[in-house]
Regions:
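Short alpha-helical elements
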Residues: 1-207
């Protein structure tokens, strides 16, 4: 049997983080369809992100609403901080027993083509100037993703580095105060900058 797109475990994680729906006035008549259940919306979001199907080509089915509806709720939940809180919860569960590799963090980026453009897109210098975005990711020593920033594809790798490190959440550990800085930050030549090195030394040692 195929693994469900939204398992019970995932849904139990996400549901408490979703904004509470507004209570409708029972004396007012509402036209149109009944709102989709949030779990169905999440199922459509996960399907689109896993397959890469454009939102406008994702049809409404018995499993999820239309792609445009899923995209609208994805953005709404993003603005509400749902995904950030989910990440912090998961990282905290790893940090409490000491499973976050704070001895070093590795930063890197990858460009992704975005044919239709939009926010955080720009001409890619590595893809014949086609429009795209760049994903900047910071992971711990074991490859656990700690933070991610999205920029236009024509932004330099090092531009969001300080913001990426500063955005790390304070995570509880086995003892002492919560921690949010790795001992060392490592990157390739694209991150070689004396100014950034000095800034990072205030809280961690770059390589």
């Amino acid at each position: 049997m195929a693994e469900p797109l939204v398992s019970e475990t995932l849904w139990r994680r996400v549901e408490p983080l979703l904004p509470k729906p507004k209570v409708r006035n029972r004396h007012r008549q509402y036209a149109g369809r009944k709102p989709s259940h949030p779990r169905k919306i999440l199922r459509g979001i996960v399907f689109a992100l896993r397959t890469g199907v454009p939102w406008e080509y994702l049809p409404a089915t018995s499993e999820w609403p239309s792609g445009q509806t899923c995209l609208r709720w994805l953005r709404r939940w993003q603005r509400a901080g749902v995904w950030k809180r989910l990440l912090v919860e998961l990282l905290s569960e790893l940090a409490r027993p000491g499973k976050i590799g704070w001895e070093r963090a590795i930063v890197d980026s990858a460009s992704v083509r975005v044919p239709h453009g939009g926010r955080n897109t720009g001409p890619s210098p590595v893809d014949r100037r086609k429009r795209g975005s760049k994903h900047h990711v910071l992971v711990d020593a074991q490859g656990v993703p700690l933070e991610l920033v999205l920029t236009a594809a024509n932004r330099n790798d090092i531009t969001p580095l300080l913001g990426l490190v500063d955005a790390l959440p304070a995570l509880p550990g086995k003892r002492g105060r919560p921690r949010k800085r790795p001992d060392r930050v490592q990157g390739d030549r694209g991150y070689d900058s004396e100014r950034h090195r000095q800034e990072l030394k205030k809280g961690s040692s770059p390589s």
